[in-house]
Amino acid sequence: MKKWLGSLLIALLVLAGCNEQEATPSEESSPETEQGTESGFPLTVTDAVGNEVTIEKAPDAIVSMIPSNTEILFALGLDEEVVGVSDYDNYPEAAATKEKIGGFEFNVETITALQPDLILAHESAWSTAEAGLQPLKDAGVPIFVVDNAMSFDETYETIEAIGEVTGKAEEAETLVADMQKQVEEIEAKLAEVEDKKTVFIESSGDPEIYTAGQGTLMQEFLDRINAENAVADQEGWLMMNSEEIVSRNPDVIVLTYNYIENAVDAVKARPGFDQVTAVQQDAVVQVNEDIVTRPGPRLPLALEELAKAVYPDLMND
């Protein structure tokens, strides 16, 4: 039985250092899309890694290799069409009942047995997943690599792209419009913030503390809630030691991970952190990792979680 290195942990690591690739909204006139029948199928599209993918009909057996893709599929009403998901898929609840294809390693034999007519892979882990999926590609199974969304707009475009290849383009447009409306409502609550809080986003704990600078989705979250990034002078995802965090003295520290027990207390107990404003003001906050790190339909909820973490008084008004 062959097992191939899968997508999830690597997706997070690659996300830390990869360059952004802008997705292009699909249109009938786009050179990247060729539509046939009125239903939109057969359909030929170009995916995030430049591969031309032909889909003969609206898929009814979809394998999703990463949780964000799965959340999008369910939000588009494709509950029954999803036949396989990763070991880490836990939302919505129905996703947890689907056949598991593996976690850090995916099982190509399990995927094959599901007889998928569409596989949704992810750009951030494609370099390691490609070889394992090659037998399925050779057998004629369409494999669409989804863009590694690094912004709100790219997330919307990803949803629209998945909607297109699954025959749910209208549903995708409706979903995106609803998300945009929710985002606008949250932004409106914080539009008049005068005393902006400085925030340190901590995506992993000791001994390797990672944070997010410019050009990341986390930076856009902070921009949209009228907060300052404590590492706005840095680019992308980077590792930072405790001493540097203390010197930057953030007003709020947001923990976007759940794998360390009593993480908030652990941060407060670090040497020198008793001098940090966030610790003195009891503003070290842990948020739901799944919600804030998956670029998908829960993006507005992620924005709300971060807004409540940074400006609890304003968000509770």
Regions found by a protein language model. Name each.
Residues 126-131, 147-161, 196-217, 260-263:
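Extracytoplasmic ligand-binding site segments that recognize negatively charged/polar headgroups
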Residues 154, 160-164, 173, 177, ...:
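Structured C-terminal subdomain patch of bacterial secreted/periplasmic proteins
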Residues 61-114, 118-125:
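A short, structured surface patch at a secondary-structure boundary
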Residues 108-121, 141, 242-255:
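Proline-aspartate-enriched helix->loop->beta-strand connector
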Residues 66, 123-124, 234-237, 256-260, ...:
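Short secondary-structure boundary segments
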Residues 2-8, 16-68, 169-199, 249, ...:
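Bacterial Sec-exported substrate-binding components of ABC uptake systems
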Residues 86-91, 210-237:
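Alpha-helical, coiled-coil/dimerization segments enriched in small aliphatic residues
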Residues 47-50, 99-109, 234-242:
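Short helix-initiation/N-cap motifs at beta->coil->alpha
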